[in-house]
A protein has these predicted regions:
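Short gly/ser-rich loop at a beta-strand->alpha-helix junction or flexible surface loop bordering the NTP-binding
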Residues: 1-160
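Surface segments flanking catalytic/ligand-binding clefts of nucleic-acid enzymes
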Residues: 137-213
Length: 213
């Protein structure tokens, strides 16, 4: 049986993946554990990811399973994730893709919080409080805008996921640090949100310069 991390624990796992971009696995290949054990979950984490996870661990269980709160493990009964929206961390442990994680977190975060998180997932850094600089660099983003657009398209209705769609319309991929993310949002957001309303073409993109003859 597979333990599927969720919410803040899934975000922590994605941040600890660093430069590794996992390939999604089919939802039919994941048999979710209905009654996950906290000790087994922690042991699987330590075999797949660096460091000790923050407690409590948040995990997804099948719809209708008992809800567990308190202690070292919190369970979230939910429907099965869409096909291709699960990443295998090791045998027995998985987490949602970045796009699926944003869908999970949408009800819990404000529009601006979602936008800041989107900047991180679409950038080349991961927030890591345990790291000396509070972040670590990675060579490529974990999420592309079109991947999130595809995931939101599965909702079926244009009125679904309004906060995520709002954030996606304003996200600028390619940020290399939290400070860059804050700067680009300050420049690009409208004045009512504390920004300057400037058009930002992109971040950290290559620029071809013609040689001087």
């Amino acid at each position: 049986m597979t333990i599927l991390l969720s919410h803040t624990s899934a975000l922590e796992a994605l941040r600890r993946l660093g430069c590794i971009r996992q390939e999604p696995i089919g939802a039919d290949a994941v048999a979710l554990d209905c009654a996950p054990d906290a000790l087994r979950a922690a042991a699987l984490w330590e075999s797949a990811l660096p460091g000790t996870p923050q407690a409590p661990l948040h995990v997804q269980v099948p719809q209708g399973s008992p809800r567990t709160r308190g202690g070292a493990l919190v369970t979230h009964p939910m429907g099965e994730p869409p096909a291709g929206e699960v990443l295998s961390l090791c045998k027995g442990l998985a987490c949602p893709t970045p796009s699926q994680l944003l869908v999970q977190l949408e009800p819990r975060l404000t529009r601006l919080e979602l936008l800041v998180l989107m900047e991180e997932l679409m950038g080349t850094y991961a927030v890591r409080p345990d790291a000396p600089r509070g972040m670590v660099a990675r060579p490529s983003p974990l999420l592309a805008p079109e991947e999130l657009e595809t995931r939101l398209g599965l909702a079926g209705s244009a009125t679904n996921h309004r906060k995520l769609r709002w954030a996606l319309d304003r996200a600028v991929p390619g940020s290399a640090s939290p400070r860059e993310s804050k700067l680009v949002l300050r420049l690009s957001l409208q004045a009512s949100l504390g920004g300057y309303g400037l058009a930002v073409a992109g971040l950290n993109q290559g620029l071809a310069v013609a040689g001087i003859a």
